[in-house]
Amino acid sequence: MSKVTGKVSQIIGPVIDVEFQAGVDLPKIYDSLEIKKADGSILVLEVQSHIGENTVRTISMDSSDGLSRGAEVNATGSAIQMPVGDDVYGRLFNVIGDAIDGLGNLPKSGKDGLPIHREAPKFEDLSTSTEVLFTGIKVIDLIEPYAKGGKIGLFGGAGVGKTVLIQELINNIAKGHGGLSVFAGVGERTREGNDLLREMLESGIIKYGDDFMHSMEEGGWDLSKVDKSVMKDSKATFVFGQMNEPPGARARVALSGLTIAEYFRDGAGEGQGKDVLFFVDNIFRFTQAGSEVSALLGRMPSAVGYQPTLATEMGAMQERITSTKRGSITSVQAVYVPADDLTDPAPATTFAHLDATTVLSRKIAELGIYPAVDPLDSTSRILAPEILGKDHYSCAQRVKELLQRYKELQDIIAILGMEELSEEDKMAVGRARRVQRFLSQPFHVAEQFTGLKGVLVDIKDTIKGFNMIMDGELDHLPESAFNLKGTIEEAIEAGEKMLAEA
């Protein structure tokens, strides 16, 4: 097949129009095109629409600085490809599948690569089993348990702890799960990606070899000491398109990460599929970038200025994040909530696709309770006695009822004070405040902030602890004894100590 080439005819920021000769087959929608820039680097474009007889409108995956009209453009004949295979373990890629860890690019043509735009699995291929995924985080395991192979959303405004919670989940699940993890950094801070890589190296989820670790401990970052034979034992792969990237890259990087997760899930052949964890931080930036691209392409905006295709784009991606008979993808997605408004179209569209939602609340964060999960706003599809068992379900319902009662009484307390409450209500408020504080716990990834060692709490201990508080066995202990504690034994010990000192 002869190479199809065209010329740049218009450049408006990241939107580039390419003109081809008359009679040539135009590149298909979502095909990638390449421009060789003056400095020798290659700029990748993705076709978005066909204009007139022989022009395509594209969006660039990197900055269009230095481009000029008339530059030659080559059609690749396929969508953007991501490298797959055993060599991707422990590696960092960008949106177009190039390595960004300084360890050299991997081949991604033919059987070594997969296109980032793919169909979702067929209905008959989907898995229907339900299994609980325990995280060791009390509030999540008790109130809104996560399903293995399910989709989980962490909703929260700016600075309430989404990234810390997602890093704790990576720490708890990825270490305990022993399976593979794929992390897609979508339009977030580059520093967080850097911190995460260092943390993964220290915890042994990514392996660069002993020589490199010694150089890292001494404050260096000597890539010549990386042992590539050890690297294949790594349990994670990263794909980054951070907030300094143009909108084209941020709108596609979630799909690039998902492509690698799908490859791990389905394997190269029958019976080779695996259980994969897919972390996305932050899915809102995917929507935000889609809105920027939509505006740049001249589409009429929809509600609150979002793209008219918001639900379609979100659905096309979310339907691919699913579990099949070959393997499962359990995805954890952080969702930024603009101005703490859960009815904003971006978070509201995401809600429809999830099995469990963890809503982080600024009011709870202000009380110093971390993780700042709102137990009354958070939901789970699998919170049912036939899946979790009677004890777990009834304990979760009692906790919710108690906290709901406390919420209703707060207006009365604010106006009239505690004295005006009946004895029964006073007791309920005291227990609710203890329950609220006991829902907090110290995190491994936040040790440097809290000075407390992180804990994983078994679900049996969690249920026992909350039942003791609600049954009134611990009414004599001060409320502050329950804050940032793991098990109920720790809280009792701290409470007895406080009483002795008083």
Swiss-Prot record:
It holds the Pfam family ATP-synt_ab_N. The keyword Translocase applies. It comes from the Bacteria. It is a peripheral membrane protein. It catalyses: ATP + H2O + 4 H(+)(in) = ADP + phosphate + 5 H(+)(out). PANTHER family: ATP SYNTHASE (PTHR15184), ATP SYNTHASE SUBUNIT BETA, MITOCHONDRIAL (PTHR15184:SF71). GO terms for molecular function: ATP binding; ATP hydrolysis activity; proton-transporting ATP synthase activity, rotational mechanism. Keywords: ATP synthesis, ATP-binding, Cell membrane, CF(1), Hydrogen ion transport, Ion transport, Membrane, Nucleotide-binding, Translocase, Transport. Its main location: membrane. This is ATP synthase subunit beta. It comes from Cellulophaga lytica (Cytophaga lytica). It is an enzyme of class 7 (translocase). One of its GO terms (cellular component) is plasma membrane. Belongs to the ATPase alpha/beta chains family. Signal peptide: none annotated. It is found in: Cell membrane. F-type ATPases have 2 components, CF(1) - the catalytic core - and CF(0) - the membrane proton channel. CF(1) has five subunits: alpha(3), beta(3), gamma(1), delta(1), epsilon(1). CF(0) has three main subunits: a(1), b(2) and c(9-12). The alpha and beta chains form an alternating ring which encloses part of the gamma chain. CF(1) is attached to CF(0) by a central stalk formed by the gamma and epsilon chains, while a peripheral stalk is formed by the delta and b chains. PROSITE patterns: ATPASE_ALPHA_BETA (PS00152). Produces ATP from ADP in the presence of a proton gradient across the membrane. The catalytic sites are hosted primarily by the beta subunits. ATP binds at G156, G157, A158, G159, V160, G161, K162, T163. Its EC number is 7.1.2.2. SUPFAM superfamilies: C-terminal domain of alpha and beta subunits of F1 ATP synthase, N-terminal domain of alpha and beta subunits of F1 ATP synthase, P-loop containing nucleoside triphosphate hydrolases.
